[in-house]
Amino acid sequence: YVEDDYRNIEGQYDAFVSIGMLEHVGRDNYPALSELIKRSLKPDGIALLHSIGRNRPMLMNAWIEKRIFPGAYPPSIGEFMELCEHSDFSVLDVENLRLHYAQTLSHWMDNFTANQDKVTEMYDEHFTRAWRLYLAGSIAAFRAGSLQLFQVVFTHGDNNQLPRSR
């Protein structure tokens, strides 16, 4: 088990799991990440990448880029697949969990609202308003289908020992 910056990972493992990191790597770093995953997986190793995504390639919203996630880039499913193609991974499963994530964000909004006074004391009113706007907008975007939550399972090599279904 390794919990570290992906660039520091050494050794080989049976599995590589990344939750909510790909959208923060930056598209220019996908080839390096792909090579690292390939190098880190044992033969027949399995990987799962889970990332916020979009319907098509586009620049990040300027407000979110500035206020919430500087440098983030949620990929389209095609860009996600390019990462897999770069290292000749065998894609086994692609799932879109966007409605699950909309519900998660809704719970986050409820918790944020319940603790809004504490958050404002820790930061300021501007921060609180920005995050409420971000959470509300994200809930709407996931529900409407303009944001996605992709989960992709793939192997290094032809691992035919895995279950044929979820």
Model regions and ranges:
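Conserved SAM-binding strand-loop segment of SAM-dependent methyltransferases
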Residues: 1-6
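A short His-aromatic
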Residues: 8, 24-25
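A short acidic, Gly/Pro-enriched loop at the edge of an enzyme's catalytic core
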Residues: 7-17
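Serine-hydrolase catalytic core recognition
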Residues: 30-33, 49-51, 57-58
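A short glycine-rich, Lys/Arg-flanked "PGG" loop and its adjoining helix->strand segment in the class I
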Residues: 31-46
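Substrate-binding/catalytic lobe of Class I Rossmann-like enzymes that use SAM or dcSAM, i.e.
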Residues: 52-164
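Residues lining the SAM
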Residues: 18-23
